[in-house]
Amino acid sequence: MEACRVRPELSKTVEQIDKSLWRLNIDSAGGETWEYVTKEEAEKRPLTIAEKYFLGFDLDLPKRPPAKTPLESAEYGYEFFRRLQLPDGHWASPYEGPMFLICGAVFAFYISQTPFPKGWAPEIIQYLINHTNDDGGWGIHTEGVSTVFGTSMNYVVLRILGMDAGHPVATRARNRLHELGGAIGCPHWGKFWLATLNCYDWDGVNPIPPELWLLPDWIPFHPGKWWCHVRLVYLPMGYMYGERLKCPKDSLIMQLRKELYVENYDSINFADHRNTISDVDLYFPHTQILDRLNWILEKYFTYLRPSWLKKLGTRRAYELIKIEDQNTDYSCIGPVNAAMNTVCVYFHEGPSSKAFQKHIQRLHDFMWVQPEGMLMRGTNGLQVWETSFTLQALVESGLYEKEAFKPDIAKALEFLDRQQIRTQYEGSGYRYNSLGAWPFSNITQGYTVSDTTSEALRAVLLVQSLPDFEKLVDIPRLRLSVDVILGMQNENLGFASYEPARTGEWMELLNPAEVFGNIMVEYSYPECTTSVILALRAFTKYDPGYRRDEIENTIENALEYVVKMQRPDGSWYGSWAICFTYAAMFATGSLASAGRYYENCPVQKKACEFLLSKQRPDGGWSESYMACVTGVYTETESSLVTQTGWALDALINAKYPDRKPIEKGIKFLMASQKSDGSWQQKSMEGIFNKNVAIAYPNYKLYFSIYTLGKFAKQYGNYLTI
């Protein structure tokens, strides 16, 4: 895999280790962990092509002449991508970009005095060095401007991992942090971590009352009604805040107290800085309602809080932490709460407890090694998500007909068969029904996701409808999946991500995070809604008698939502990737499934006109993550393969009658293809919480394959211009 960014002038100033000694291990549940082996072990276990690709080594693949037809280009693309399929049938992904994740893992190891695994420290340092901005700091993600949050967290990481304060990288980072006003301007999550490290006072952290979990479930603002990622992050934060837990002072902590702030640490009145947030960090300011609630809660904590209620609150919070740990086998829903839960368990049960040891081991699942160094991924992988789309691309493009590709498809189907959740979670952890669902990553994490379940279901149905493949997922299990999906439709007729919305969007008035938008509750999304529509359409063809009327009613209502969400200019806003091209691909697909095309549907016509107005002279499309941040279509300097594929797919979905602009885009995809069949990574593709970009590097591969093959089927496998 080509590096997104390498800065040799900086990386050579720190320890370099032999990258060829890394090996990727896959467990029986599809979990992915990197291990740094000895030279003797490496000789017995040569690097695979997939490992070479991820680590940035030359694959020494034959060079192909440029493809002459779209389908040949798609075939070249899959000839490359199939080499990356792992032995258990899935495709892996770095899923990198956010710069506030690695700190959690490093802090958990440091606070618990757990030695870092071999190879971690030098590789993490390399990654952070390679992703420093020109001003010396770090942003909230790798393409973002330097912020107090990113710079302070990653500065502390470098110091914990052994970088001297006088090192040029540390000096530049510290100078940039001070230019931004110092760590006193950290947002809520940053203040929490610094307080946990004993580098900030808990009095300066806005209240995170664990007593909220004692409220009756029917109360509209009960945390069990929040978006699952937020409630599962504020759960351990509340436990830590309630107990005011922090690691002991040592020489490094005392040095960090001096280095992180512009003022003398002992002179800072931290309580005065609960709401001090750097302007460059602030994306979602506090509402007056939240500030008033925080003032009331602070008075409660200071003067009124009975010790018995505090004990009940922290006890209930820890019970829920244990439920989350047990239901995910300590993987947790994501890396943020995984690290926080690890710290909570360390303080509550001790370093020798089985729970803590399991947590520390599970943190390995989030770590990834690539040319720039070691990073922490946005989840413990994209196993089910990536495999589902790859299967769809192979079927929809017609490449499944090639005998050489059939074993790959069979292995991928077997993987999805194993990943369907066949047991219900235990305990009252506020999780949505998971029986029959597919998770985003793997079955260990096990959270229901509406679009992953839908895309996996559709992939299984497409493959099992072909004559050469076993029907591994039987009818009863397919029906369980449909049951899960049908229960997830929101009142506004759309579908959210993990579960139906449980309370109103007014909860966003209480968003305390400052750096993220639309996080407090579940929202409906055109992308998730379309995934559901297409999966249910495929299911009714496969099993036409099951809940037919309910399915048709659900689809019709969902289509109404998709139409309603179109903007006046013909676009849809994408919340899970960048941005308007991504949403257009999904929305036009849902309409096409109902027989609505350019010629008979004004909604499709407006969508096509919007997309064509954004096509660039070279035939491609381009979108920056800033489109998600601002809600306004924003381009990067050059056309991008992934966004071009999405825009073309939308036009093909709508059956746009003039093939010339579509063909122009197809020619761009073909011309952008490298001689080994792959396409180059230029920019991140994904987004979450409106403000954080994240990479899906396989998108440029399977979506290009999908679009090229789909064009050949619908418009003919030839070019006229």
Curated annotation (Swiss-Prot):
Where are PFTB repeat segments found? 121-162, 555-595, 604-645, 662-703
Purpose: Lanosterol synthase; part of the third module of ergosterol biosynthesis pathway that includes by the late steps of the pathway. Erg7 catalyzes the cyclization of (S)-2,3 oxidosqualene to lanosterol, a reaction that forms the sterol core. The third module or late pathway involves the ergosterol synthesis itself through consecutive reactions that mainly occur in the endoplasmic reticulum (ER) membrane. Firstly, the squalene synthase erg9 catalyzes the condensation of 2 farnesyl pyrophosphate moieties to form squalene, which is the precursor of all steroids.
Look up the record and name the pathway of this protein: Terpene metabolism; lanosterol biosynthesis; lanosterol from farnesyl diphosphate: step 3/3; Steroid metabolism; ergosterol biosynthesis
What InterPro entries does this protein map onto?
A: SQ_cyclase_C, SQ_cyclase_N, Squalene_cyclase, Terpene_synthase_CS, Terpenoid_cyclase/PrenylTrfase
Q: What class of enzyme is it?
A: isomerase
- A Gene Ontology biological process annotation? ergosterol biosynthetic process
Please give the chief subcellular localization of this protein: other
Q: Which reaction does it catalyse?
A: (S)-2,3-epoxysqualene = lanosterol
- Write out the similarity annotation: Belongs to the terpene cyclase/mutase family.
Which E.C. number(s) belong to this protein? 5.4.99.7
Name the membrane topology term. Peripheral membrane protein
> How is this protein named in the record?
Lanosterol synthase erg7
UniProt KW keywords: Endoplasmic reticulum, Isomerase, Lipid biosynthesis, Lipid droplet, Lipid metabolism, Membrane, Repeat, Steroid biosynthesis
Q: Which PANTHER family match?
A: LANOSTEROL SYNTHASE (PTHR11764:SF20), TERPENE CYCLASE/MUTASE FAMILY MEMBER (PTHR11764)
Miscellaneous notes for this chain? In Aspergillus, the biosynthesis pathway of the sterol precursors leading to the prevalent sterol ergosterol differs from yeast. The ringsystem of lanosterol in S.cerevisiae is firstly demethylised in three enzymatic steps leading to the intermediate zymosterol and secondly a methyl group is added to zymosterol by the sterol 24-C-methyltransferase to form fecosterol. In Aspergillus, lanosterol is firstly transmethylated by the sterol 24-C-methyltransferase leading to the intermediate eburicol and secondly demethylated in three steps to form fecosterol.
